[in-house]
Structures are given as C-alpha cells and as structure tokens.
Amino acid sequence: SVFYGQYLQVMDSGSKEAPIVIGVYGEGDAPRIEACGQGIWYQNYGTPLDSPTHVYHGYVSSAVLLYDAEYIIVEDLEITNDADEIIGEYYSLGDKMNRTGVAVVAKDKGVRHGITLRNLLIHDVNGNVYDKHMNNGGIYITALRPEHEDVTGVARYQDVTVEGCFVYQVSR
C-alpha cells in the first residue's frame, strides 16, 4: 500500500508487556508513507539556543511522528517526505520547511521508554539545510524542555533501539 500525502502521528503509548507495533502485515511490499510535506507539527526547545541565529522553534513536517509516546515499535516501512510539488520551494531556500522521515520527541512526560525503529527504508526527505537544531533529516530523536519541568522532570529516553534502517537522499 502507498499512503500518498499522508502521515502517521502517534501521541499515545503501549506498555512494556504490549507495545504498539506499526509495520507490515501479510505478504507483499512494505507499506510506503509518502508525506509530501504534510504531518506538520510545532517544535519548540523551550529556550533560546546559544546563538541568536540558531532557530529553536518552528514548524516541522514528519512522515512519522512519535510525540511523548513510549513502548512503540515502528518496523518494515518505506518512508519519504520530499514535497516536490510545492511551487517556489527549492533546495537552498532559507525558510524551507523542516522535514523528517521519522521524528521521535520527548517533552512533557519525563522519561520515555521502549522506542524501536527497525528495518525502515527512509529516503527523499528534503528539508531545510540551514536549521541545524530543528528536527530535519531521515531519523531525528529529540528531548525538548518540558513546559512544567518541575513536575515532570527532564525529558529523556531509556531503551531506544534503531537497527537495520537504511537512510539515503536526505538533506540533513
């Protein structure tokens, strides 16, 4: 199956005993998610970075987004996010949309556990080549500053596995 102009955003969790598994079932080719610049969400580190020229907040397009989720397995998918059809958007445009194939984000729930990315084919993810601190590229795993850090603690990960993934033709 090809999911053209579609994306997957997971903002819920499985459990250690019963993780959420997203992947192929049955026979045939791997399902392909072609986000085409869709799946837009807002990234905010929560604090300015060390240089005023470094972008620390803005919109990102992700074909697959795991946001504050845990105990998730994403496997055996083909993922693209190139959006060639956006008129006037070219490779070195300074305000080009940031894009990822897969973005994994921890922010407001403390420690996130059990994230597995396995046997993913990620290609043709063409985002902004300048915003080096924004989620931008094939696979991007980020911990952002929580809104209520005094309550949730620092956002971070434990037990993350990325294996057997092949990433090519991405702009960052």
Spans of model-derived segments:
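Short active-site-proximal "capping" loops at secondary-structure junctions
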Residues: 2-5, 27-29
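Extracellular beta-strand/beta-solenoid scaffold signature
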Residues: 5-10, 40-65, 88-108, 130-157, ...
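N-terminal targeting/docking segments
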Residues: 10-16, 161
